[in-house]
């Protein structure tokens, strides 16, 4: 039976984890990637980064972060040889082993294929059977214990019943990722490149991965938006349109350094604006003084009965002086404005702001959800009776496959229960990657909000969407052209700014496939929501940031 608790996490409550992870048996390596002025161009010739990339990657664990679309996947392919640079060069000292969700999407026929070890394993097996070729001898060199290493790696990954011949189609998304990570453990590569390795992993598997990373003695390049995983790295590189920024330390130090840089940039902008204001005030005073001086000179000339030729000469001199002063002042103003613009470019954007409609607020005591003798389909554990009132924030946790998504779909009316009932007493909305993908691809966000009878006038909608960092460049685009993070924010806006705004949000792994900044923006938006939340997520930091009032542990 599921269990519900309120308030803080119970003392000593830890999720179960796969077996302990031994340190890699592969000796520590001096492997390094060297990026020397590396650039990559899109098919239309556009440079992906305004500054070419130069970086040395040696021993230790390097984290790579950045918004979706800045080229993290391209960088991974450049590092591992999947792409050739358009400029500069990539130097590799040794063999790299890549774990990447797009590779798993091709659904290799067997586990050995997904582990990247099928060819070497087949060579070892042919050698053992006395059928080896000369190529097999090369492939099997130093790999005599590969079958044992594979079995141990699969067991360490919590997959003791999986063999190299198991079809990948028989495994869940989380199990497929663990298979790929087991391949990295068993491979005798000099360096590991892990691209979003915690995707589809539940909390116990993420904890296992974090422990393994800390114990791994080979260089690791980790591309991730998982804040807990990024706490296991030694250095973080942030990739953006302008290129690379390097930060020493793990995620905590990265945040501290970014905050310090943001504070310094804000102070520099304030200083530049103050300097401009002071200089402009001085220019105005000097201009007024020149005007007074020229007026006095004209009066003196008239009273001195000077000749017309002399007066004309004085006038021409004054006009030339005025033109020179105007040009000089314009140059000064231009330089001051440029200094302010340059300082402003270094200032991070203000945090995304989300303001829900008053109708989304749930008052204390208002019944939100009631479950009566609910039995989920597919044999999931029963829910006896449960009811929730007021602006509750329920964290729904449990391992992959335990029925969390099924529960949310039954509550939302998308699946019928096997028995019993789930009754919603307030308007609701489902917020997940599927809901975001279901937005009408050909409609703009503004058009869709009008379709939903939003009570907000267009000007206010634009203002609110801009506060969510969905500016003019986004709201006029077809929603199919928006990124995953932008579509999720669009789905949130539609849920809470429609004619009948949602008072309860059902969130199913909403941060999957979001970059780190988009995750933080969604987190801040939900923190200010005054309705009720029911959130299923393996992102522990995301859950804790929402300050759950109830914790609903769903059994395996």
Located regions from the model:
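Coupling and communication elements adjacent to P-loop NTPase active sites across diverse families
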Residues: 2-12, 27-41, 120-177, 257-378
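ABC ATPase nucleotide-binding domain signature region
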Residues: 61-62, 73-136, 238, 391-402, ...
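ABC transporter NBD signature
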Residues: 68, 172, 400, 483
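ABC-family P-loop ATPase nucleotide-binding domains
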Residues: 103-170, 433-503, 509
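Hydrophobic anchor residue at the start of the ABC signature
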Residues: 181, 492, 511, 522
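ABC ATPase C-loop
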Residues: 185, 388, 496-498
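Catalytic Walker B motif of ABC-type/P-loop ATPase nucleotide-binding domains
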Residues: 192-196, 201, 431, 504-509, ...
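Conserved H-loop
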Residues: 227-232, 253, 539-545
């Amino acid at each position: 039976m599921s269990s519900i608790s309120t308030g803080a996490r119970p003392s000593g409550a830890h999720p179960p984890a796969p077996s302990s992870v031994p340190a890699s048996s592969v000796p520590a390596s001096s492997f390094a990637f060297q990026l020397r002025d590396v650039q990559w161009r899109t098919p239309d010739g556009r440079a992906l980064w305004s500054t070419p990339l130069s970086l040395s990657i040696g021993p230790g664990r390097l984290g790579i972060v950045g918004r979706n679309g800045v080229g993290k996947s391209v960088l991974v392919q450049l590092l591992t040889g999947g792409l050739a640079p358009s400029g500069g060069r990539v130097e590799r000292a040794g063999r790299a082993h890549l774990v990447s969700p797009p590779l798993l999407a091709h659904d290799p026929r067997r586990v050995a294929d997904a582990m990247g070890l099928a060819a070497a394993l087949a060579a070892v097996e042919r050698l053992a059977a006395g059928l080896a070729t000369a190529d097999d001898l090369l492939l099997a060199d130093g790999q005599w214990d590969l079958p044992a290493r594979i079995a141990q790696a699969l067991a360490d990954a919590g997959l003791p019943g999986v063999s190299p011949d198991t079809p990948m189609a028989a495994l869940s998304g989380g199990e497929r990722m663990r298979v790929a990570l087991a391949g990295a453990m068993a491979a005798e590569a000099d360096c590991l490149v892990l691209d979003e390795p915690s995707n589809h992993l539940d909390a116990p598997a993420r904890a296992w991965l974090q422990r393994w990373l800390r114990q791994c003695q080979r260089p690791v390049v980790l591309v991730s938006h998982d804040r807990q995983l990024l706490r296991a790295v030694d250095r973080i590189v942030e990739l953006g349109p302008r290129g690379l920024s390097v930060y020493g330390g793990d995620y905590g130090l990265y945040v501290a350094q970014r905050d310090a840089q943001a504070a310094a940039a804000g102070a520099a902008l304030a200083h530049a604006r103050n300097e401009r204001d002071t200089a402009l005030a001085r220019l105005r005073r000097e201009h007024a003084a020149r005007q007074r001086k020229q007026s006095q000179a004209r009066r003196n000339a008239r009273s001195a009965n000077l000749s017309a030729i002399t007066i004309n000469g004085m006038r021409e001199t004054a006009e030339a002086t005025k033109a020179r002063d105007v040009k000089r002042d314009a140059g000064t103003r231009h330089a001051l404005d440029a200094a302010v613009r340059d300082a402003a470019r270094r200032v991070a954007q203000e945090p995304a702001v989300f303001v829900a409609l008053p109708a989304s607020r749930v008052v204390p005591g208002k019944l939100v959800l009631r479950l009566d003798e609910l039995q989920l389909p597919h044999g999931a554990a029963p829910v006896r009776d449960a009811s929730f009132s007021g602006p509750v924030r329920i964290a729904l946790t449990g391992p992959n496959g335990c029925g969390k998504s099924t529960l949310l779909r039954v509550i939302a009316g998308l699946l019928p229960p096997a028995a019993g009932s789930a009754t919603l007493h307030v308007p609701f909305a489902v917020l997940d990657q599927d809901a975001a993908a279901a937005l009408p691809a050909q409609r703009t966000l503004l058009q869709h909000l009008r379709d939903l009878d939003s009570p907000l006038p267009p000007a206010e909608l634009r203002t609110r969407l801009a506060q969510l960092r969905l500016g003019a460049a986004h709201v006029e685009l077809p929603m199919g052209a928006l990124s995953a993070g932008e579509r999720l924010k669009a789905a949130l806006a539609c849920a809470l700014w429609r004619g009948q705004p949602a008072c309860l949000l059902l969130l199913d792994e909403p941060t999957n496939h979001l970059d780190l900044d988009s995750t933080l923006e969604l987190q801040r938006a939900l923190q200010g929501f005054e309705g009720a939340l029911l959130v299923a997520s393996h992102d522990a930091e995301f859950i804790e940031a929402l300050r759950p009032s109830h914790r609903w542990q769903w059994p395996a």
